[in-house]
From Swiss-Prot:
It is a multi-pass membrane protein. The lineage of its organism: Bacteria, Pseudomonadati, Pseudomonadota, Gammaproteobacteria, Alteromonadales. Its main location: membrane. This is Na(+)/H(+) antiporter NhaA. The keyword Membrane applies. GO terms for molecular function: sodium:proton antiporter activity. It comes from Shewanella sp. (strain MR-7).
Amino acid sequence: MEKAIRNFLSQESAGGILLLVAVALAMLMANSPLAGLYQGFLGTEVQVRVGALDLHKPLLLWINDGLMALFFLLIGLEVKRELLEGALSSVAQASLPTFAAIGGMLVPAGIYLLFNYGDPVTQAGWAIPAATDIAFALGIMALLGSRVPVALKVFLLALAIIDDLGVIVIIALFYSTDLSTISLIIASIAIVGLVALNRKGVTALAPYGVLGLVLWVAVLKSGVHATLAGVIIAFCIPLRAKDGSSPSEHLEHSLHPWSTFLILPVFAFANAGVALGNMSLNTLISPVPVGIALGLMLGKPIGVMLFSYAAVKLRLAQLPNGIGWKQIAPVAAMCGIGFTMSMFIASLAFEQADPMYGDLARLGTLIGSIIAALIGYFWLSKVLPKQGV
Protein backbone atom coordinates (compact mmCIF):
# COMPACT_ATOMS: atom_id res chain seq x y z
CA MET A 1 0.00 0.00 0.00
CA GLU A 2 2.88 2.39 0.87
CA LYS A 3 4.46 1.95 -2.57
CA ALA A 4 1.14 2.63 -4.32
CA ILE A 5 0.57 5.80 -2.30
CA ARG A 6 4.10 7.04 -3.01
CA ASN A 7 3.70 6.41 -6.74
CA PHE A 8 0.41 8.31 -6.67
CA LEU A 9 1.87 11.22 -4.76
CA SER A 10 4.93 11.49 -7.00
CA GLN A 11 2.61 11.95 -9.97
CA GLU A 12 0.57 14.55 -8.08
CA SER A 13 3.78 16.42 -7.22
CA ALA A 14 4.65 16.81 -10.90
CA GLY A 15 1.04 17.76 -11.61
CA GLY A 16 1.16 20.42 -8.89
CA ILE A 17 4.11 22.08 -10.60
CA LEU A 18 2.24 22.02 -13.91
CA LEU A 19 -0.80 23.60 -12.21
CA LEU A 20 1.38 26.45 -10.95
CA VAL A 21 2.73 26.99 -14.47
CA ALA A 22 -0.83 27.05 -15.87
CA VAL A 23 -1.95 29.61 -13.27
CA ALA A 24 1.10 31.80 -13.85
CA LEU A 25 0.55 31.69 -17.62
CA ALA A 26 -3.14 32.57 -17.22
CA MET A 27 -2.35 35.52 -14.94
CA LEU A 28 0.38 36.70 -17.30
CA MET A 29 -1.91 36.63 -20.33
CA ALA A 30 -4.84 38.24 -18.50
CA ASN A 31 -2.64 41.16 -17.43
CA SER A 32 -0.71 41.75 -20.65
CA PRO A 33 -1.42 42.91 -24.21
CA LEU A 34 -2.44 39.28 -24.81
CA ALA A 35 -5.54 39.70 -22.61
CA GLY A 36 -7.84 40.10 -25.62
CA LEU A 37 -6.44 36.95 -27.21
CA TYR A 38 -6.86 35.05 -23.93
CA GLN A 39 -10.49 36.10 -23.41
CA GLY A 40 -11.31 35.65 -27.10
CA PHE A 41 -9.89 32.13 -27.09
CA LEU A 42 -11.94 31.10 -24.06
CA GLY A 43 -15.04 32.72 -25.57
CA THR A 44 -14.72 30.84 -28.88
CA GLU A 45 -18.05 29.21 -29.69
CA VAL A 46 -17.83 25.44 -30.14
CA GLN A 47 -20.83 23.62 -31.61
CA VAL A 48 -21.58 19.90 -31.66
CA ARG A 49 -24.65 18.79 -33.61
CA VAL A 50 -25.92 15.21 -33.88
CA GLY A 51 -29.37 15.01 -35.45
CA ALA A 52 -31.76 17.06 -33.33
CA LEU A 53 -29.17 17.42 -30.58
CA ASP A 54 -27.40 20.79 -30.72
CA LEU A 55 -24.78 21.73 -28.12
CA HIS A 56 -23.49 25.26 -28.60
CA LYS A 57 -21.22 26.68 -25.89
CA PRO A 58 -18.11 28.86 -25.43
CA LEU A 59 -14.88 26.93 -25.04
CA LEU A 60 -14.70 27.90 -21.35
CA LEU A 61 -17.99 26.10 -20.63
CA TRP A 62 -16.87 23.02 -22.57
CA ILE A 63 -13.87 22.90 -20.26
CA ASN A 64 -15.93 23.45 -17.09
CA ASP A 65 -18.80 21.13 -18.06
CA GLY A 66 -16.97 18.55 -20.16
CA LEU A 67 -13.38 18.11 -19.03
CA MET A 68 -14.34 18.56 -15.39
CA ALA A 69 -16.95 15.80 -15.75
CA LEU A 70 -14.02 13.47 -16.48
CA PHE A 71 -12.24 14.79 -13.40
CA PHE A 72 -15.32 14.09 -11.28
CA LEU A 73 -15.50 10.63 -12.83
CA LEU A 74 -12.01 10.06 -11.44
CA ILE A 75 -13.01 11.50 -8.05
CA GLY A 76 -16.03 9.19 -8.00
CA LEU A 77 -13.85 6.16 -8.74
CA GLU A 78 -11.48 7.13 -5.91
CA VAL A 79 -14.33 7.68 -3.45
CA LYS A 80 -15.92 4.32 -4.30
CA ARG A 81 -12.61 2.44 -3.92
CA GLU A 82 -11.82 4.07 -0.58
CA LEU A 83 -15.35 3.43 0.72
CA LEU A 84 -15.30 -0.26 -0.21
CA GLU A 85 -11.69 -1.31 0.26
CA GLY A 86 -9.53 1.62 1.34
CA ALA A 87 -9.04 4.21 4.04
CA LEU A 88 -12.80 4.76 4.49
CA SER A 89 -13.89 1.12 4.48
CA SER A 90 -14.38 0.86 8.25
CA VAL A 91 -15.88 3.16 10.85
CA ALA A 92 -12.61 3.24 12.80
CA GLN A 93 -10.62 4.34 9.75
CA ALA A 94 -13.18 6.81 8.45
CA SER A 95 -14.20 8.55 11.68
CA LEU A 96 -11.35 11.04 12.13
CA PRO A 97 -11.08 12.22 8.49
CA THR A 98 -14.89 12.46 8.33
CA PHE A 99 -15.13 14.77 11.34
CA ALA A 100 -12.10 16.71 10.09
CA ALA A 101 -13.66 17.18 6.66
CA ILE A 102 -16.99 18.32 8.12
CA GLY A 103 -15.26 20.93 10.27
CA GLY A 104 -13.09 21.92 7.33
CA MET A 105 -16.21 22.73 5.32
CA LEU A 106 -18.46 24.33 7.94
CA VAL A 107 -16.02 26.81 9.49
CA PRO A 108 -14.71 28.30 6.19
CA ALA A 109 -18.28 28.63 4.92
CA GLY A 110 -19.21 30.37 8.17
CA ILE A 111 -16.30 32.82 7.89
CA TYR A 112 -17.26 33.66 4.31
CA LEU A 113 -20.90 34.25 5.27
CA LEU A 114 -19.79 36.44 8.17
CA PHE A 115 -18.02 38.79 5.75
CA ASN A 116 -20.82 38.67 3.18
CA TYR A 117 -23.84 38.82 5.48
CA GLY A 118 -26.80 40.65 3.99
CA ASP A 119 -25.68 40.55 0.35
CA PRO A 120 -27.74 37.91 -1.52
CA VAL A 121 -25.44 38.03 -4.56
CA THR A 122 -22.15 37.41 -2.78
CA GLN A 123 -23.67 34.99 -0.25
CA ALA A 124 -24.03 32.52 -3.12
CA GLY A 125 -20.28 31.93 -2.89
CA TRP A 126 -20.41 30.45 0.63
CA ALA A 127 -19.18 27.03 -0.56
CA ILE A 128 -16.08 28.37 -2.35
CA PRO A 129 -13.70 28.16 0.66
CA ALA A 130 -15.23 24.84 1.74
CA ALA A 131 -13.37 22.91 -0.98
CA THR A 132 -9.92 21.29 -0.90
CA ASP A 133 -7.87 20.66 -4.04
CA ILE A 134 -6.85 17.04 -3.49
CA ALA A 135 -4.26 17.03 -6.27
CA PHE A 136 -2.50 20.19 -5.15
CA ALA A 137 -2.61 19.40 -1.42
CA LEU A 138 -1.14 15.94 -1.95
CA GLY A 139 1.39 17.41 -4.36
CA ILE A 140 2.65 19.86 -1.72
CA MET A 141 2.95 17.03 0.81
CA ALA A 142 4.81 14.91 -1.75
CA LEU A 143 7.57 17.54 -1.91
CA LEU A 144 8.64 16.36 1.56
CA GLY A 145 9.16 12.83 0.25
CA SER A 146 9.77 9.92 2.63
CA ARG A 147 9.87 12.22 5.66
CA VAL A 148 6.07 12.12 5.71
CA PRO A 149 4.65 9.07 7.55
CA VAL A 150 2.36 6.93 5.41
CA ALA A 151 -0.42 7.25 8.03
CA LEU A 152 -0.33 11.03 7.64
CA LYS A 153 -0.58 10.76 3.86
CA VAL A 154 -3.54 8.40 4.18
CA PHE A 155 -5.23 10.82 6.60
CA LEU A 156 -4.92 13.72 4.15
CA LEU A 157 -6.04 11.53 1.24
CA ALA A 158 -9.11 10.30 3.15
CA LEU A 159 -9.97 13.80 4.38
CA ALA A 160 -9.68 15.27 0.89
CA ILE A 161 -11.83 12.51 -0.61
CA ILE A 162 -14.59 13.08 1.96
CA ASP A 163 -14.28 16.80 1.25
CA ASP A 164 -14.76 16.07 -2.46
CA LEU A 165 -17.83 14.00 -1.63
CA GLY A 166 -19.19 16.98 0.31
CA VAL A 167 -18.54 19.26 -2.67
CA ILE A 168 -20.45 16.84 -4.91
CA VAL A 169 -23.46 17.01 -2.57
CA ILE A 170 -23.23 20.82 -2.40
CA ILE A 171 -23.21 21.13 -6.19
CA ALA A 172 -26.22 18.81 -6.49
CA LEU A 173 -28.26 20.60 -3.82
CA PHE A 174 -27.32 24.26 -4.17
CA TYR A 175 -26.01 24.88 -7.68
CA SER A 176 -28.65 23.22 -9.84
CA THR A 177 -31.23 25.56 -11.40
CA ASP A 178 -34.05 25.68 -13.98
CA LEU A 179 -34.58 21.93 -14.01
CA SER A 180 -35.87 20.30 -17.21
CA THR A 181 -38.28 17.42 -16.57
CA ILE A 182 -37.69 15.72 -19.94
CA SER A 183 -33.91 15.83 -19.55
CA LEU A 184 -34.17 14.47 -16.00
CA ILE A 185 -36.32 11.58 -17.25
CA ILE A 186 -33.73 10.74 -19.92
CA ALA A 187 -30.99 10.97 -17.29
CA SER A 188 -32.95 8.64 -15.00
CA ILE A 189 -33.33 6.08 -17.80
CA ALA A 190 -29.58 6.24 -18.43
CA ILE A 191 -28.89 5.71 -14.72
CA VAL A 192 -31.21 2.69 -14.65
CA GLY A 193 -29.26 1.30 -17.61
CA LEU A 194 -25.92 1.86 -15.84
CA VAL A 195 -27.18 0.18 -12.67
CA ALA A 196 -28.49 -2.75 -14.75
CA LEU A 197 -25.05 -3.18 -16.35
CA ASN A 198 -23.51 -3.26 -12.89
CA ARG A 199 -26.04 -5.76 -11.53
CA LYS A 200 -25.54 -8.01 -14.55
CA GLY A 201 -21.82 -8.06 -13.87
CA VAL A 202 -20.82 -6.35 -17.11
CA THR A 203 -17.13 -5.43 -16.80
CA ALA A 204 -16.46 -4.08 -20.30
CA LEU A 205 -16.14 -0.30 -20.06
CA ALA A 206 -17.57 0.51 -23.51
CA PRO A 207 -21.27 0.04 -22.56
CA TYR A 208 -20.76 2.27 -19.52
CA GLY A 209 -19.12 4.83 -21.78
CA VAL A 210 -22.06 4.91 -24.21
CA LEU A 211 -24.71 5.22 -21.50
CA GLY A 212 -22.45 7.63 -19.62
CA LEU A 213 -22.32 9.95 -22.63
CA VAL A 214 -26.13 9.89 -22.84
CA LEU A 215 -26.29 10.65 -19.12
CA TRP A 216 -23.82 13.54 -19.43
CA VAL A 217 -25.80 15.19 -22.25
CA ALA A 218 -29.09 14.71 -20.38
CA VAL A 219 -27.69 16.12 -17.15
CA LEU A 220 -26.11 19.02 -19.07
CA LYS A 221 -29.54 19.88 -20.48
CA SER A 222 -31.40 19.22 -17.21
CA GLY A 223 -30.15 22.15 -15.12
CA VAL A 224 -28.20 19.86 -12.77
CA HIS A 225 -24.48 20.47 -13.20
CA ALA A 226 -23.03 18.10 -15.78
CA THR A 227 -20.03 17.11 -13.64
CA LEU A 228 -22.37 15.06 -11.43
CA ALA A 229 -22.79 12.66 -14.35
CA GLY A 230 -19.15 11.66 -13.90
CA VAL A 231 -19.74 10.73 -10.27
CA ILE A 232 -22.84 8.66 -11.10
CA ILE A 233 -20.98 6.77 -13.83
CA ALA A 234 -18.10 6.06 -11.44
CA PHE A 235 -20.38 4.58 -8.80
CA CYS A 236 -21.94 2.24 -11.38
CA ILE A 237 -18.68 0.78 -12.73
CA PRO A 238 -17.89 -2.51 -10.88
CA LEU A 239 -14.99 -2.40 -8.44
CA ARG A 240 -14.31 -6.12 -8.80
CA ALA A 241 -15.00 -8.64 -11.57
CA LYS A 242 -15.53 -12.36 -10.96
CA ASP A 243 -11.95 -13.10 -12.02
CA GLY A 244 -10.62 -10.69 -9.39
CA SER A 245 -9.71 -7.90 -11.81
CA SER A 246 -10.92 -4.36 -11.20
CA PRO A 247 -12.55 -2.45 -14.09
CA SER A 248 -12.91 0.54 -11.78
CA GLU A 249 -9.23 0.66 -10.80
CA HIS A 250 -8.17 0.07 -14.42
CA LEU A 251 -10.16 3.13 -15.51
CA GLU A 252 -8.91 5.12 -12.51
CA HIS A 253 -5.27 4.42 -13.39
CA SER A 254 -5.94 5.29 -17.03
CA LEU A 255 -7.58 8.61 -16.12
CA HIS A 256 -5.00 9.72 -13.55
CA PRO A 257 -2.32 10.99 -15.95
CA TRP A 258 -4.95 12.69 -18.15
CA SER A 259 -6.42 14.42 -15.10
CA THR A 260 -3.06 15.40 -13.62
CA PHE A 261 -1.30 16.55 -16.76
CA LEU A 262 -4.16 17.79 -18.98
CA ILE A 263 -7.60 18.29 -17.41
CA LEU A 264 -6.62 20.20 -14.25
CA PRO A 265 -3.91 22.35 -15.88
CA VAL A 266 -6.29 23.28 -18.74
CA PHE A 267 -9.02 24.10 -16.21
CA ALA A 268 -6.58 26.20 -14.17
CA PHE A 269 -5.39 28.05 -17.28
CA ALA A 270 -8.98 28.75 -18.37
CA ASN A 271 -10.21 29.93 -14.96
CA ALA A 272 -7.24 31.51 -13.17
CA GLY A 273 -6.72 34.50 -15.45
CA VAL A 274 -7.78 37.47 -13.32
CA ALA A 275 -7.28 40.97 -14.78
CA LEU A 276 -5.91 43.14 -11.97
CA GLY A 277 -5.70 46.41 -13.90
CA ASN A 278 -9.22 47.60 -13.09
CA MET A 279 -9.14 46.56 -9.42
CA SER A 280 -8.63 49.19 -6.73
CA LEU A 281 -7.37 48.52 -3.22
CA ASN A 282 -10.94 48.76 -1.94
CA THR A 283 -11.97 46.11 -4.45
CA LEU A 284 -9.16 43.79 -3.38
CA ILE A 285 -10.19 44.00 0.28
CA SER A 286 -13.91 43.64 -0.44
CA PRO A 287 -15.95 40.90 1.29
CA VAL A 288 -15.70 38.26 -1.48
CA PRO A 289 -11.90 37.88 -1.78
CA VAL A 290 -11.34 38.51 1.94
CA GLY A 291 -14.01 35.99 2.96
CA ILE A 292 -12.60 33.34 0.63
CA ALA A 293 -8.94 33.94 1.51
CA LEU A 294 -9.57 33.94 5.26
CA GLY A 295 -11.91 30.97 4.93
CA LEU A 296 -9.13 28.98 3.29
CA MET A 297 -6.18 30.28 5.36
CA LEU A 298 -7.87 30.28 8.77
CA GLY A 299 -11.23 28.56 8.49
CA LYS A 300 -9.92 25.32 7.05
CA PRO A 301 -7.22 24.62 9.67
CA ILE A 302 -9.41 25.83 12.54
CA GLY A 303 -12.35 23.69 11.39
CA VAL A 304 -10.24 20.58 10.77
CA MET A 305 -8.42 20.87 14.11
CA LEU A 306 -11.49 21.82 16.17
CA PHE A 307 -13.68 18.99 14.90
CA SER A 308 -10.83 16.45 14.98
CA TYR A 309 -9.91 17.36 18.56
CA ALA A 310 -13.53 17.22 19.69
CA ALA A 311 -14.04 13.83 18.01
CA VAL A 312 -10.96 12.36 19.71
CA LYS A 313 -11.84 13.81 23.13
CA LEU A 314 -15.40 12.49 22.84
CA ARG A 315 -13.97 9.09 21.81
CA LEU A 316 -15.77 9.21 18.49
CA ALA A 317 -12.45 8.83 16.66
CA GLN A 318 -8.77 8.23 17.36
CA LEU A 319 -5.50 9.54 15.99
CA PRO A 320 -3.60 7.29 13.55
CA ASN A 321 -0.82 5.23 15.13
CA GLY A 322 2.38 7.24 15.53
CA ILE A 323 0.69 10.52 14.58
CA GLY A 324 0.20 13.40 17.02
CA TRP A 325 -1.48 16.78 16.93
CA LYS A 326 1.75 18.51 15.92
CA GLN A 327 1.62 16.56 12.62
CA ILE A 328 -2.14 16.95 12.15
CA ALA A 329 -2.01 20.76 12.51
CA PRO A 330 0.13 21.52 9.41
CA VAL A 331 -1.90 19.02 7.40
CA ALA A 332 -5.00 20.95 8.48
CA ALA A 333 -3.33 24.07 7.08
CA MET A 334 -2.72 22.27 3.77
CA CYS A 335 -6.46 21.61 3.54
CA GLY A 336 -6.81 25.34 2.87
CA ILE A 337 -5.48 24.78 -0.65
CA GLY A 338 -8.80 25.20 -2.44
CA PHE A 339 -7.36 26.13 -5.81
CA THR A 340 -9.07 24.34 -8.75
CA MET A 341 -12.01 23.02 -6.70
CA SER A 342 -12.73 26.45 -5.18
CA MET A 343 -12.42 28.08 -8.61
CA PHE A 344 -14.85 25.53 -10.00
CA ILE A 345 -17.45 26.29 -7.33
CA ALA A 346 -16.87 30.02 -7.92
CA SER A 347 -17.72 29.52 -11.60
CA LEU A 348 -21.06 28.01 -10.51
CA ALA A 349 -21.81 30.44 -7.69
CA PHE A 350 -21.38 33.58 -9.80
CA GLU A 351 -22.36 32.17 -13.19
CA GLN A 352 -25.31 34.58 -13.52
CA ALA A 353 -23.72 37.50 -11.64
CA ASP A 354 -21.46 40.34 -12.76
CA PRO A 355 -18.16 38.83 -14.05
CA MET A 356 -16.37 41.00 -11.48
CA TYR A 357 -17.56 38.66 -8.72
CA GLY A 358 -16.00 35.68 -10.46
CA ASP A 359 -12.71 37.56 -10.79
CA LEU A 360 -12.76 38.51 -7.11
CA ALA A 361 -13.55 34.92 -6.11
CA ARG A 362 -10.66 33.57 -8.17
CA LEU A 363 -8.33 36.18 -6.72
CA GLY A 364 -9.35 35.29 -3.16
CA THR A 365 -8.90 31.61 -3.97
CA LEU A 366 -5.39 32.17 -5.36
CA ILE A 367 -4.28 34.26 -2.39
CA GLY A 368 -5.77 31.94 0.23
CA SER A 369 -4.54 28.75 -1.46
CA ILE A 370 -0.97 29.99 -1.97
CA ILE A 371 -0.65 31.19 1.63
CA ALA A 372 -2.19 27.94 2.94
CA ALA A 373 0.25 25.92 0.82
CA LEU A 374 3.27 27.86 2.08
CA ILE A 375 2.18 27.66 5.73
CA GLY A 376 1.36 23.95 5.47
CA TYR A 377 4.60 23.06 3.70
CA PHE A 378 7.02 24.93 5.97
CA TRP A 379 5.13 24.00 9.14
CA LEU A 380 5.06 20.29 8.25
CA SER A 381 8.71 20.44 7.19
CA LYS A 382 9.60 21.84 10.62
CA VAL A 383 7.77 19.21 12.69
CA LEU A 384 8.84 16.15 10.66
CA PRO A 385 12.12 14.33 11.29
CA LYS A 386 14.97 15.38 9.03
CA GLN A 387 15.47 11.88 7.64
CA GLY A 388 12.93 9.55 5.99
CA VAL A 389 10.84 7.35 8.23
